[in-house]
Amino acid sequence: MKPSIILYKTLPDDLLHRLEAHFTVTQVPNLHPETVARHAQAFASAQGLLGTSETVNRALLEKMPALRAASTISVGYDNVEVDALTARKIVLMHTPTVLTETVADTVMALMLATARRVVDVAERVKAGEWTESIGPAWFGVDVHHKTLGIVGMGRIGMALAQRAHFGFTMPVLYHARRRHQEAEDRFNARYCDLDTLLQEADFVCVILPLTTETRHLFGTTQFARMKSSAIFINAGRGPVVDENALIAALQNGEIYAAGLDVFEHEPLSVDSPLLNMSNVVAVPHIGSATHETRYNMMACAVDNLIDALQGKIEKNCVNPQAAG
């Protein structure tokens, strides 16, 4: 008899068939309490859980006594109570490698769009404001040869540094928990403390996970340390930034512009002042959102769950100690 799993994400047919070859699959729209109650028997017997974005907490785990592995279609997992899973000896699998290049592309796009005011001037053209040869009111600023500061030199940070160093001849500064010798050797990146990075960088790009230490790492003090010409990019997690402090910094001219893929609360409220600022490019958490990469993430998550329920957790496991 095949193990049973709960699937709370719609998958392409080929990936669904791959799951069904190994498991009895119960598909549900979400992990809301009413959904769990409606499918109580399936949740109670499920050994695997696969999906994305929904909260996985102690209350859910109480309804899933047979659960052995959870697989998220994401690199981030701040919506999952990892400690609760580990205490139950449930492994958590994620997809950290397949989205690296795509997210780095998104960060680069935000840098270019904010610096060259692509969204702002495109909207002005659509509004019929381009009636004569443009002047300085339409100008942006250069990207090439400007100093890039990367906060969080992981896989995505490395991919961004590669693009900036080789493609745009940008000096690269970085701040991370530890020195990254490969970044220094390949891209001539310079490690520095956060204050120094903020003071020297023309672009401050944040690519950090959300942890107790990183929550609101960027606030009033940090924005005040940046150049008034600096462009701030966040493609990590929204709550790493105190959004009210960012709004104030933009309104007061403490920084030049911001390109944002993530926000403290998502979806972003239609009343957010960020949406009324011409120097803000706000996109709806599209970091990995290409057809190719999202498919690859789903395929990776499927393979991760198959492997985990066969006891293979050598790669992509968040909490390998749970298997001990």
Swiss-Prot record:
Q: Which residues form the active site?
A: R237, E266, H285 (proton donor)
Q: Where in the cell is it found?
A: Cytoplasm
Chief location bin? cytoplasm
UniProt keyword annotations, A-Z:
Cytoplasm, NAD, NADP, Oxidoreductase
Cited InterPro entries: D-isomer_2-hydroxyacid_DH, D-isomer_2_OHA_DH_cat_dom, D-isomer_DH_CS, D-isomer_DH_NAD-bd, Glyo/OHPyrv_Rdtase_B, NAD(P)-bd_dom_sf
Assembly and interactions?
Answer: Homodimer.
The name this protein carries in UniProt is Glyoxylate/hydroxypyruvate reductase B
Identify the species of origin.
Answer: Salmonella paratyphi B (strain ATCC BAA-1250 / SPB7)
The gene behind this protein is ghrB
